[in-house]
Structure formats: structure tokens, C-alpha cells
Swiss-Prot record:
Task performed by this protein: Mediates the binding of virions to the host cell receptor and is involved in membrane fusion.
Segments crossing the lipid bilayer: 1182-1202
The protein's name in its UniProt record: Spike glycoprotein
Cellular component aspect of the GO annotation: membrane; viral envelope; virion membrane
Quaternary assembly: Homotrimer.
InterPro entries in UniProt: S_torovirinae (IPR031412)
Gene: S
Region forming the signal peptide: 1-15
Stretches assigned to the Intravirion side: 1203-1220
Glycosylation sites: 60, 80, 111, 262, 403, 601, 644, 711, 774, 789, 1004, 1028, 1091, 1121, 1143
Family from the record: Belongs to the torovirinae spike protein family.
Organism of this sequence: White bream virus (isolate Blicca bjoerkna L./Germany/DF24/00)
Keyword Metal-binding (UniProt): no
Membrane topology: Single-pass type I membrane protein
């Protein structure tokens, strides 16, 4: 199989090679690093894990950049491309901090060859720098000395501690340059040399067109990698610290560290160069939520700065000329082959959570098989992370198949059918055309992701050599045709020295992918698999700075312009990045619990290794020349040196190692956390580009089309269906004892005759009960369907502009206030009907309030009727279980008798030890009878199991329906009411502003809740949550019930230690807004106040104020049924009572009352659906639907109740008599 894979890969790679260049691929540069004069800012970065933990790190970098463009090298016949340093794409806009480093820097030319640690052969003794001549090679040295660094809290705007070393630490940078002076200043000074001299240097070799020296000052990192979560079940599976990245194993810190700590992190998570497709091939269950991935992100940022500081020291060695013979025969370079072997060796030794041994992998796979064609999807319906899910499943099956633990795997058998005879991926309509970039390479990547883990080490080494022969690598190049996921990059485990990180990782989570290509769909036996460079996050999500992305994710395009939320740091650890000389180095590692500290000692350096320097490039090597001491510690700001600075260690590992390039030493903090994280995604909108919708007082509200599901140009409908899809079905022969057990066998009939005579009456009663049960289920389904017909989310037409009309089923009341809880204030209303004129409102207002109050009681009857119906079905189920039990017990007794009798015959047969034909035939008969009896008993047990399943299904359905009604009562269209797919059908952003006044926001892709309109502050706020009967609270502060005050909450966390003023001062709820209607001067409101007084305001004038009488009490229990006529009488009494108190006469609204009565009569014959009409008619129809549903429920409930009562009285007597 591995040989087939290699051949397929060769053909694919060859096909890619042949499209633009018959020889080797062409390197291209896609990194656009960018113009900023000087970067000397301390950057705090906070990475949240959505619990009370966070990873925080800070970087500091100083470099004399200018706005010039720096051309890339021209190598042989390859293309010449340029790049521009663009720090806006790398660093987020966070306020600059005070200088983190107390740094002193000097820059000189080394005139003594003995003092230059690089190869003396390239050194030329010269005069001072001011008199540099042409075509000479020089050794430059920069020395940076630092004494301390601050840990700075940007929210509190003060230092929280600083890192202190007893002795000054010095970092020296050496550089060898062969220069050709161009436009040399006539009399440059030493300070001018910093900005002019190096920019004027040009090399005479053919590879380098421009070389700029940029000194690197170092990084300071604080992070906590002690916790991780499994991708398979992140909510309740916590990976222990031993599965986190560990640097204290009893191994030497050798080659794995030569390209920064990200290789260790990548080895733990089985991440590959680009960090994408091979996620599917790793056998570890750690993924994006693990600290290893955070280390990967942090090291990516560090390495980017390192690469910008020294842009050409990561591509050592020579390259093949543009000829196929060189590519295939000489290979790329042996250095990289050895490096890969070291990585592979280290990877084999690491502790990795094995997918095969973890049952959570099955849970993860099943969890993502929620849809028919995709395992998951985005909010917009596109496939989500299908490649990860599918490949994990396929990898598990394939590995089990190759290990012999599975005899066959259909998925593995399907793999060869995905290609044609040449190994190319077969064309499908939803695939990119074959001439485009990634088409074939995607399949090769997929194929290798499946089979690469099954290779032997010898096969992997052979395959790696093959890849090295046909693939081209260079810093800044992606691969053939800029395909991001070239098999060369993904499979070969290339070091970061040869392949850059993709721009998506350099700018984590803050930008759209810049690769230019979306994922491709590959149809497989279990669904469409997305393979490509857009890789959403599995697990429960990740927060970076103030942006949180959860599953399923939504693309977010914005610049983060505010600092991280308030956090508290206990600075108990530090990671220091320093330059280490290329020599023998002693190290000591002390551990205490999960913390560790590594000290390097270069006081006795070995002879430096001679580095081969190609003529086509210059090499800058960093050298750290001062010994680190074991007494480096973290000293809290403003406290004495011994506070929080002493550590006891219980384990020590020491040794020596041989390093070539940078080494990162890590010391983990033992405590780092965020207080009370708040769930949710908060997007800062650019409100200047939004449409102003309305103004209330001094506040302007804006409309954001990306935050609403309302579409005013078309009528949409959401179907909510709670029907039971299947009835209980049984083979009719089950109810005929002898035919079911014996068919036509006379011997069997004889044996079971007496048994069937006893059990046949019970089976007849059971059959009758089943038929009644199925009829009851049909009635129950019909009832629920009738009720759900009233819960549809419709749009009605009142003006040429359509608007959203939400149906209230039921129009219930909140738990805390005796009034509807679905509206809090203007601009935050869940559903606000727009009414035409103030006159119309004045005539209809009292009637609206009266009917709304009465319907609350009717709704309670509806709820109780549903509960009563459910209680009846529970009783029916219990009756069936009661009568099945004697049947089962009888079968068990018969089975025991047959067993006992068979045993007696066998014992007698053994004792006599005489074989006779007659006895043998008799025993065979008994065995046959016994087998048939057991089969029959099994059928009955299946019936019982089916009943149990149905009862669970009915209970689940009832619970879901109850939850849906409850959610609708609070104006939340929850997953209990509607599927994600249905919700997506109406989630079509509209460019037509219209009268949109409902903002919907998605939480985890399914539940919809309603949000405020955008205010001039530019922040979306969820509706305030009631926490008692008289107050409400805004979400940017949190209420402390102990102190009665509020404390600060950011986008991700709250800080209980800081007391602030509440966003909204506690005040009584003024009113509930029923409607908004326009006036020439603005907006008027129709409200019900909290003291149950109905008011109509025109401007600031109260037109009328009427007290609302208490509604009548409607009761509906299992023994008392409220008839529809009684409910109508009570409703009419309520209307009459209100008419006596209103300021309007009956004649003024008689036409409305007449129309209302006609609608009531029509509702008795059918359930009315919405259609075009006036707003007032639509409101009446809401009421009519509810009344009609009450009629249907009461009638059906009465019928079911009577039938149950009859069943309760008759069935037990019949069964008991027959059993006797």
C-alpha cells in the first residue's frame, strides 16, 4: 500500500511540476511583512481557554526598520520577487507601553580576527568604519546589555512586577558581510551607520541583492501550559499535565530546539509545517485547545520577529539548478534529511494520548455526524471541519484494519476508487477544475494523511528521501503553484528553517485567510469532506485577545482596537529567549510539581563549530556571552526581593548539549487565571458605516444587516413540527400463539397446546391495547400538530413595506412580573408591531390590553391540557407494562420447565448410557420446542423494549415541546422549536433597510436571542436580564448580590475586585412596550405600566389611563374540563367589564366588535393562518388561533381521557380473569 501511495504521490507532484515549469518549482514569497519606522513596544497577549485559565505572553522587539522595500534573493533562473515589511499585519493596535527593557546597545566593527567567533577566513582587517572600502568582508558586533524588565498591566495602567537578574546580561550579535559600497556617505559617523551604512551595502554574489542588519533584543514570555482539554469532549475531559508539552524529560535538549520551541509543541500535537491537514493524521487527541497549540502560536510570532531580524539565516546550504536531474538524483540537502530524522526520533519518544486507546474518539465522531451530508456546518450552512472528523474516523478504521483488529473496512476499500488509472483525483462537479492549483494535491495530502501513520520507519525514511528529491523548499516559498497544502510540506516534517508559517498563523484569528483558496469538497462514503486551507477550530473554541471563536465559527473581519479585558496575573514564572553560542553548553533543569526552570551555563565554551557559509548569502549568528545564574527570580512590584521569589525544587536533570542556533528556555508560571469569564462573542461594529434607524432622546440606534434574520422583501415561514413519526408495529402472528410458535408443525402444536390456551386471551387483550395505544398516539400527534401550527414565525403585510410579526404562543407572563416579559425598553424589544396612527391606537388600545390579559388564562389552560394529555399517555403506557409483565412471567416459567425437563432427560440418558432411536428423537423434539419457545420469549421482550423506547420518545417529545413553548414565551426561538437547518433558511441578510427592528444573534450556531440595536458607543449589548421584580442590569457590569453593587466586566471576564457604577442605575421598570407608532414629531408608545395601568401617550400627553381588572381564573384538571363555551363566556364577561370602564362608547368600536365576532365563528371551523391584512386583523387572528387550539386540545383530551378511563376499568379485569 505504501508503494502505491508513493507512486500516486509522484504522479501528482509530477503533474503539478509540469504545469508551469518542467524542472523544479518556482519559489514565491507571500509573506508581506510591512512599513513601520521603529517597533519598540511591549505587547501583552492574552489567550483565553474559556474557563478560569489564560495564557499571557509579552514580546519586545527593537529594530531600525525604514519604509524601504527589500528584494528577495535571485537564485539562478528563479523569479525575482519583492516583499514589504508590514507590521500592521503582525501586531495588533494596542497602546504602547513604557520601555520594557532597561537596555544599552553598542555597535562596532571587530578589527581583531581572534575576537570574531565566525570563520576567520572571511575576516579582513580594516580601518575604522568611516573608511570602509569596496568589496571587503567585515565582522560587525552589536552588544545589548539589560538589567531588568517590567510585567505591565495595561488595564490598570501600572506595572505588576518586574523580572530581575542579579547581574547584567549581555547579548552580542555578530555578522559577516562581504560588501560593495554604493552611495557611501562622504563622512559618515557611527550613529549614521545605524541607518545608512547597512542599507548602502550590496553583495557582489549573485544571490543577494540587498542585505540589512537588524539587531534583535530578545523576548520575554509568561505563559501557563499546565492544562489542556481533549478535542473529543472538551467539556468534561481534562488532559492531565503529563500530556502537556514537557521539557524536563531525561533527554538531551538537542536538535529539536534548533528551530525554536514550536517543534516540540508541534510534536506533541502532531502538528505539521502549516498546521492544517495533518491534524487528521495525528494519533494524539490533543488539538487546538491544548497549550501546545498556544505554544505554537507564540513561537510563530517569536520566529517571525526572528526571521525579520535576520532574514537570510534560515536557508542554509545550496540549491539545485533548474534541472530535473539535480532534483531527482542529488536530492535537496542532507542537512534537512538529518533534521527530519531527529524530529521523528523525538516525536516517537513523546507522551501522546493514543487515539486507538481512547473511547472519546468514538464520541467525537458520533457527535459530528449530526447532519446527513456533512458532519457539521457553519452558520451559513457550509461544511465545517469535515476533514478533521472524517480523517480521524478513517484513520482509526485504517489503522485497525492494517493491525489486524478489523477484518475489513469499507472506507479503506473506497480509497482506490477515488482516483483514475493515473492516480489523479476523479473530477466531480463540486471540485475545482483540474488546471487549478490544489486539485490533485488535495487528494495526495488526504491519501498520505490516511496511510502515513502506518508506514514503518524504513518506509518513512525512503518516502522522505523521495519527497526531498522532487520538492523544493525555501523561506518565503509555499510550494508548486502556491498550493498551501503541498504534500512536500505536510508529509516531510520539514523544519521551520525551510518553510515559513502561513500568514493565518502569523496573524492568528484576526484576519481572513490570505491564501486565496477555499476548501475543496471530496465526496466520500460518509459525506462530503472539505480539504483545504480554511480550517475552523474543533473543540469548544478559543479566545484571542478580545475575540472569541466558538464552534461553529463565523468569519469575523475587524481590527481589535481595545486592550485585553481586565485580568489578574500572579507573576510566578518567566520564559527568556536568548542567543546561545554554537558550542558545547551545560544545562541544569530544576522541577517542582508542574513548574520547572532550565539554566544554561556557557562559562566553559567548547571550540565553536565552523559553519559553512555559501557565497550567495550572508549569515548572522546570535551569541549570548554572559552566564545565566540560578538566582534569577520574579520580584513582585513594590515589594521586597524575598517575597514570592523563593522556590524549592525536588528534581534535577543536568547534562550538556550541542546547539547551533537559538534556544528558548522556559519557566512556567504556577498560577495564572482570569476571573469569572463571560461566554459570548462580542464584535465591535464600525457603526459609522451602518444605517441610522431611529433616535430616542439623545441616543441614536443603528441597523446592522449582518446581525439580523429579518428580510423585509419576502415572506418567510418557519415550520415547527413535533409529530411522532412512527407507531408501534408488530407481526400479526404474534397475537396467534400456536401459529407464531409452531407454524404448521403438529408436534410443536401438541407440545404448546395447553400453553397457548392459557396465554391466547392475554394476547388478545394485548392486541386490543396496542390498537388503542396507536389510536391514542395518532390523537396525540394530531393535537400537537394543531398546536404547533400556531407557533409558526410569520411575516404579515400591513404597508407596502413588509415587517416582521412574531406570533406569541402562548402570550404568557414572566416569572418575576405579572406582565409580559418579552419587552424591556425601546430599541431592545423582541417584537414590536408598528401601528398606523394614534387614532387607531386610541380606539383599539383598551381592547388589546383586555384580550391580552384574558388570553394569559386561556394559555394556562392550554398548558394544563397538554400536561393532562401527557399524564394520560403515561397511564396508558403503565397499563401496557402491567399486562405485559404476567405474559413475560408465564413465558419465563415455561422456559424454566423446558430447561428442567430437558436436563432430566439428559441426566437419565447419561445414567442408562443406552442409545435408542426413540429417546434420541424425543430429546431432539424437546430441543426444537425449547428453541422455539425462547425465540417467542425474545419477541415479547422486544415488544417491551419497543414500548420503553416509545415512552422515552414521548417523554422527550413532551419535554421538548414544553421547552419550546417556554422559550417562545420569552421570545427566544430555541433549538427546542426549530432546527439549525430551518433557522438558516430565514437567515438571509437583506440590503433593504425597511422597518427592521429586530436584531438576532446566534449563540453556538443554533439558539437565537435578541439584542439591542447598535448605539453610538458602537457596542452590541444583549437585552438586560431581570434579577428581581424592580430592577434590570446591563451586561457590561455584573451585579454583586452581597454588596448590592456592580463590578467591571469586559468582553471575556469580570473582575470582582473592582467596584464600578452600574451601566443602568437600578430603577423600577417603567413600562412594557406593546407597540410603536410614528408621529410627525417622532415616535409614540403604547405601553402597560408595571402597576397594571394601561396608558396611551401622544407625545408627552397621556390620552387615557385605565386600570386593568384582574383576569378570571380558569381551571383545568384531570377531572374537570373547561368547555369552549365557558371560556367564551368568561372572555365576553372580561370584555364587558372593560367596556364599563373605558372612555369610549360601544358604538365607536361596534364595527370592530362585529368583525371580531365573525372571526370567532370562522375559527370554530378551521385554524386560521396569516395572510395580508391590516395590523389589527393580524393581531385578532393571533387570538383566534389560540382559541381554536384550545378547542382542539380540550376535545381531544376529553376523548383520550374517556378512552383511558374505559381502558383502566375494563382491561385489568379481562386479563386477570383469563390469567386465573
Amino acid at each position: 500500500m505504501w508503494l502505491i501511495t508513493i507512486l500516486a504521490t509522484i504522479s501528482c507532484v509530477t503533474a503539478q511540476l509540469s504545469q508551469t515549469n518542467p524542472d523544479c518549482p518556482i519559489p514565491t514569497c507571500t509573506i508581506l511583512p510591512p512599513p513601520k519606522t521603529t517597533l519598540d513596544n511591549t505587547k501583552f497577549r492574552v489567550v483565553y481557554t474559556k474557563d478560569q485559565e489564560a495564557l499571557i505572553y509579552a514580546t519586545n522587539f527593537t529594530s531600525p526598520f525604514n519604509n524601504a522595500q527589500y528584494p528577495l534573493p535571485t537564485l539562478g533562473n528563479h523569479l525575482n520577487r519583492s516583499y514589504t515589511l508590514n507590521y500592521d499585519k503582525v501586531f495588533l493596535n494596542i497602546a504602547d507601553s513604557p520601555d520594557m527593557l532597561n537596555l544599552k546597545t553598542s555597535w562596532t566593527v571587530v578589527n581583531n580576527s581572534n575576537l570574531c567567533p565566525l570563520s576567520p577566513s572571511v575576516y579582513r582587517s580594516t580601518s575604522p568604519l568611516q573608511t570602509l572600502t569596496t568589496a571587503e568582508q567585515y565582522c560587525f558586533m552589536t552588544t545589548a546589555t539589560l538589567t531588568s524588565a517590567f510585567l505591565y498591566d495595561y488595564t490598570a495602567m501600572k506595572p505588576v512586577g518586574y523580572i530581575r537578574a542579579r547581574a547584567e546580561e549581555t547579548i552580542s550579535f555578530f555578522s559577516i558581510m562581504k560588501t560593495n559600497m554604493v552611495n557611501r556617505p562622504t563622512s559618515p559617523s557611527l550613529s549614521q551607520a545605524h541607518t545608512h551604512t547597512l542599507a548602502a551595502m550590496r553583495t557582489t554574489a549573485t544571490g543577494i541583492q540587498a542585505q540589512t542588519f537588524k539587531p534583535q533584543t530578545g523576548f520575554f514570555i509568561v505563559l501557563d501550559a499546565s492544562r489542556a482539554r481533549a478535542v473529543t469532549n472538551p467539556l468534561d475531559t481534562a488532559i492531565q499535565p503529563k500530556f502537556s508539552p514537557s521539557f524536563i524529560k531525561e533527554v538531551t535538549f538537542d536538535h529539536i530546539f534548533q528551530t525554536t520551541i514550536n517543534e516540540t509543541a508541534r510534536s506533541v500535537t502532531r502538528e505539521t509545517t502549516t498546521g492544517y491537514i495533518m491534524n487528521a493524521a495525528k494519533t494524539g487527541a490533543l488539538y487546538k485547545a491544548s497549550p501546545a497549540y498556544y505554544l505554537f502560536l507564540i513561537s510563530s510570532d517569536c520566529r517571525l520577529q526572528q526571521a525579520l531580524s535576520v532574514p537570510y539565516d534560515f536557508s542554509l546550504g545550496r540549491f539545485c539548478p533548474a534541472s530535473m536531474s539535480c532534483c531527482l538524483n542529488k536530492g535537496y540537502e542532507q542537512y534537512y534529511v538529518n533534521t527530519w530524522l531527529f524530529h521523528y526520533y523525538n516525536l516517537k519518544r513523546l507522551n501522546v494520548l493514543n487515539l486507538e486507546s481512547s473511547p472519546v474518539s468514538d464520541h467525537f465522531i458520533q457527535l459530528h455526524r449530526t447532519f446527513n451530508t456533512e458532519h457539521s456546518m457553519h452558520c451559513d450552512g457550509s461544511p465545517y471541519a469535515s476533514d478533521t472528523t472524517y480523517n480521524i474516523a478513517l484513520l482509526r478504521d485504517t489503522v485497525q484494519f492494517l493491525n489486524g483488529t478489523k477484518t475489513t473496512t469499507p472506507l479503506a476499500n473506497e480509497i482506490p476508487q477515488l482516483t483514475d488509472s493515473l492516480g489523479y483525483l476523479k473530477y466531480q462537479p463540486d471540485m475545482v477544475d483540474a488546471s487549478d492549483h490544489q486539485n490533485y494535491m488535495a487528494y495526495v495530502t488526504y491519501l498520505m494523511a490516511i496511510f502515513y501513520p502506518t508506514f514503518t520507519e524504513a518506509q518513512k525514511f525512503e518516502f522522505h528521501n523521495l519527497l526531498q528529491s522532487v520538492c523544493y523548499f525555501d523561506k518565503g516559498s509555499i510550494s508548486r503553484n502556491q498550493a498551501y497544502h503541498s504534500i512536500c510540506h505536510i508529509i516531510s516534517f520539514q523544519t521551520t528553517a525551510s518553510v515559513p508559517y502561513p500568514i493565518e498563523l502569523q496573524i492568528p484569528f484576526t484576519t481572513e485567510p490570505t491564501s486565496g483558496y477555499n476548501a475543496y469538497l471530496v465526496k466520500t462514503p460518509i459525506g462530503s469532506v472539505a480539504i483545504g486551507n480554511q480550517n475552523p477550530f474543533d473543540g469548544e473554541g478559543v479566545c484571542f485577545l478580545t475575540t472569541c471563536i466558538y464552534h461553529p465559527t463565523k468569519k469575523i473581519n475587524q481590527k481589535l482596537t481595545i486592550p485585553p479585558v481586565r485580568w489578574q496575573v500572579v507573576p510566578e514564572g518567566i520564559a527568556v529567549v536568548t542567543g546561545i553560542p554554537p558550542n558545547c553548553l551545560g544545562y541544569e533543569t530544576y522541577t517542582q510539581g508542574s513548574s520547572f526552570f532550565t539554566i544554561y551555563n556557557d562559562s566553559k565554551p567548547c571550540q565553536p563549530q565552523t559553519m559553512q557559509i555559501a557565497q550567495a548569502r550572508s549569515v548572522i549568528t546570535t551569541v549570548y556571552s554572559a552566564a545565566q545564574k540560578s538566582d534569577i527570580f520574579v520580584q513582585p512590584y513594590g515589594k521586597s526581593s524575598w517575597v514570592n521569589g523563593s522556590y524549592q525544587f525536588d528534581q534535577f536533570v543536568g547534562g550538556a548539549l550541542n546547539l547551533r542556533t537559538l534556544t528558548f528556555t522556559m519557566r512556567k508560571p504556577t498560577q495564572l487565571y482570569v476571573l469569572d469569564p463571560i461566554e459570548g462573542t462580542y464584535i465591535i461594529p464600525d457603526y459609522q458605516t451602518k444605517f441610522p434607524l431611529l433616535t430616542s432622546g439623545t441616543q441614536t440606534y443603528y441597523y446592522d444587516p449582518d446581525q439580523t434574520v429579518t428580510n423585509t422583501t419576502e415572506v418567510s415561514k418557519v415550520t415547527i413540527d413535533f409529530s411522532i413519526r412512527t407507531m408501534i408495529t408488530l407481526d400479526p402472528l404474534v397475537f396467534n400463539c400456536e401459529e407464531f410458535i409452531c407454524d404448521k408443525d403438529p408436534t410443536c402444536r401438541t407440545q404448546f397446546s395447553s400453553y397457548c390456551q392459557t396465554t391466547q386471551p392475554i394476547l388478545a387483550a394485548l392486541k386490543d391495547a396496542f390498537e388503542k395505544y396507536n389510536r391514542s398516539i395518532a390523537d396525540y400527534t394530531s393535537t400537537i400538530r394543531a398546536l404547533t401550527n400556531t407557533t409558526q414565525d410569520l411575516f404579515a403585510s400591513a404597508t407596502p413595506v413588509r415587517y416582521r410579526r412574531g406570533v406569541e404562543v402562548p402570550l404568557g407572563y414572566g416569572h418575576d412580573l405579572e406582565q409580559p416579559s418579552w419587552v424591556y425598553d425601546l430599541g431592545g424589544t423582541a417584537i414590536v408591531p408598528w401601528i398606523g396612527t394614534a387614532v387607531a391606537v386610541g380606539k383599539l388600545a383598551n381592547r388589546v390590553a383586555s384580550i391580552e390579559a384574558t388570553l394569559y388564562q386561556i394559555t394556562q389552560g392550554v398548558k394544563q391540557s397538554i400536561q393532562s394529555t401527557n399524564d394520560k399517555f403515561d397511564k396508558i403506557t403503565n397499563i401496557l407494562h402491567t399486562h405485559l409483565r404476567p405474559v413475560t412471567e408465564g413465558l419465563v416459567r415455561t422456559n424454566e420447565q423446558l430447561n428442567a425437563f430437558s436436563k432430566q432427560v439428559r441426566d437419565q440418558f447419561t445414567m442408562i448410557n443406552t442409545v435408542t432411536t426413540e429417546l434420541s428423537a424425543y430429546v431432539d423434539q424437546l430441543q426444537q420446542v425449547f428453541t422455539v419457545g425462547a425465540f417467542y420469549q425474545n419477541q415479547i421482550l422486544q415488544v417491551i423494549s419497543q414500548l420503553n423506547s416509545l415512552q422515552v420518545y414521548v417523554d422527550t417529545l413532551t419535554s421538548s415541546f414544553t421547552d419550546c413553548i417556554s422559550d417562545l414565551n420569552q421570545k427566544i426561538l430555541s433549538p427546542a422549536c426549530i432546527t439549525t437547518h430551518q433557522l438558516l433558511q430565514i437567515n438571509k441578510p437583506s440590503d433593504n433597510l425597511g422597518l427592521k427592528n429586530v436584531l438576532t444573534h446566534y449563540i453556538n450556531g443554533s439558539a437565537a436571542t435578541f439584542y439591542h440595536l447598535t448605539s453610538t458607543k458602537g457596542v452590541y449589548k444583549p437585552l438586560p436580564k431581570l434579577f428581581n421584580n424592580t430592577h434590570f442590569l446591563a451586561p457590561t457590569t455584573a451585579y454583586n448580590p452581597v454588596t448590592g453593587t456592580c463590578f467591571f466586566c469586559g468582553s471575556n471576564a469580570c473582575d470582582k475586585s473592582v467596584t464600578v457604577d452600574c451601566d443602568y442605575q437600578p430603577q423600577p421598570l417603567q413600562s412594557t412596550i406593546l407597540a410603536v407608532y410614528p408621529t410627525p414629531t417622532g415616535l409614540d408608545l403604547l405601553t402597560i405600566t408595571s402597576n397594571k395601568t394601561f396608558e396611551i401617550k401622544h407625545g408627552s400627553t397621556v390620552v387615557t389611563s385605565v386600570a386593568i381588572p384582574p383576569p378570571p381564573i380558569l381551571s383545568s384538571t384531570i377531572n374537570i374540563n373547561v368547555t369552549f363555551q365557558q371560556q367564551l363566556l368568561q372572555l365576553q364577561e372580561q370584555v364587558d367589564q372593560l367596556n364599563l370602564q373605558t372612555n369610549y362608547t360601544t358604538t365607536e368600536i361596534q364595527s370592530i366588535i362585529d368583525k371580531y365576532n365573525v372571526e370567532i365563528q370562522n375559527a370554530l371551523n378551521q385554524i386560521v393562518d396569516f395572510g395580508p391584512g391590516t395590523p389589527s386583523l393580524a393581531l385578532w387572528k393571533v387570538i383566534l388561533i389560540l382559541i381554536a387550539v384550545v378547542v382542539v386540545i380540550v376535545i381531544i383530551a376529553t376523548t383520550i381521557f374517556c378512552s383511558v378511563r374505559k381502558n383502566q376499568s375494563e382491561l385489568p379485569l379481562q386479563v386477570l380473569s383469563r390469567l386465573r
